[in-house]
Swiss-Prot record:
Gene3D superfamilies: Winged helix-like DNA-binding domain superfamily/Winged helix DNA-binding domain (1.10.10.10). The keyword Cytoplasm applies. The keyword Iron-sulfur does not apply. This is Segregation and condensation protein B. Homodimer. Homodimerization may be required to stabilize the binding of ScpA to the Smc head domains. Component of a cohesin-like complex composed of ScpA, ScpB and the Smc homodimer, in which ScpA and ScpB bind to the head domain of Smc. The presence of the three proteins is required for the association of the complex with DNA.
Length: 291
């Protein structure tokens, strides 16, 4: 701290035995401003002196008395040095370098960002924040969702798809993003695959036999195709002769169609598989269609 005082004294040429060169009023104002900024750096949050404490004798900017001004500056620096030297140095170091812990929301945001298109469940987030109960994590997420949706300075939102929370781009930025992203994709599912997937979604848990009955044709290879693509999963066996496998749609299904649960599916009479044949890049899991 003594070194800092010496530097400031040297900077302002404030040695008592040094002859002060007269300054103009404007130069005087600029010197006083520089001094004020330098003194501010010496103040601490623990015991912050006021200008009444350290510079009660500093003259107004309009003064033309150079000797009086520099005498006031010397007095202020000496008094500041005494105040700072009296402070607990360990406390000064702690206040200067101690890092504050990130909030739960900040950690959740970072986790969802890293998870990307896979998203994270409450259980997975709880492993990252084990000291926070899942009920509290749910509350934090709900507050984040509300905050993101209400903030017009945010181009992102958070959605829950099949129990997995994901960071997505808002619907409002779709047109702006399309100016820079020209990539379009062809839905990898043809009409037959879409029909089988719809049957599973609306009738889950569903067996292969049930799928064949509804479509009226053999759909075994189509079921295998959907299993391979990860859009349906085995969830057990039916209590019927032969104990056939039961199938549900997967988390990837919710991600692909941008819905949070089966309840969000359109009514059967309104469902048109052809409407899903083509889509824009931002209609996928990185884009929220529900705004």
């Amino acid at each position: 701290m003594k070194t800092k005082i010496k530097k400031i004294t040297k900077k302002f040429n404030l040695k008592k035995d040094t002859e002060v060169k007269p300054l103009s009023t404007q130069e005087l104002i600029e010197e006083q401003k520089e001094f004020s900024q330098a003194v501010d750096k010496l103040m601490t949050k623990k015991q912050k002196p006021t200008f009444e404490d350290i510079g009660s004798s500093i003259v107004d900017f309009e003064t033309s008395d150079n000797d009086k001004f520099y005498e006031s500056v010397r007095d202020a620096i000496e008094k500041t040095s005494e105040i700072v030297d009296d402070l607990d140095q360990s406390e000064l170091t702690k206040n200067s370098y101690e890092q504050k812990e990130l909030s739960a929301k900040a950690i959740i945001q970072a986790a969802l960002y890293v998870a990307g298109r896979n998203g994270m469940t409450l259980q997975e987030l709880n492993k990252i924040l084990p000291k926070i109960h899942q009920d509290q994590l749910f509350k934090e997420l709900e507050e984040m969702i509300y905050s993101y949706d209400q903030n017009l300075n945010f181009g992102l939102t958070i959605k829950n798809y099949g129990g997995r929370y994901k960071i997505l781009t808002k619907a409002a930025v779709k047109k702006d993003m399309q100016r820079y992203v020209s990539e379009r994709f062809k839905n990898p599912l043809n009409k037959s695959l879409m029909e089988v997937l719809a049957i599973v979604a609306y009738n889950q848990p569903c067996t292969r036999v049930r799928i064949n009955e509804i479509r009226g044709v053999d759909s075994l290879s189509l079921v295998d195709n959907l299993l391979e693509k990860g859009l349906i999963v085995e969830v057990g066996r039916a209590d019927t002769p032969g104990r056939p496998f039961l199938y549900n749609v997967s988390e990837k299904f919710f991600d692909l169609f941008g819905i949070e649960s089966i309840d969000d599916l359109p009514q059967i009479k309104h469902f048109d598989p052809d409407s899903y044949q083509e889509g824009d890049f931002f209609d996928s899991n990185r884009y929220d269609e529900n705004e």
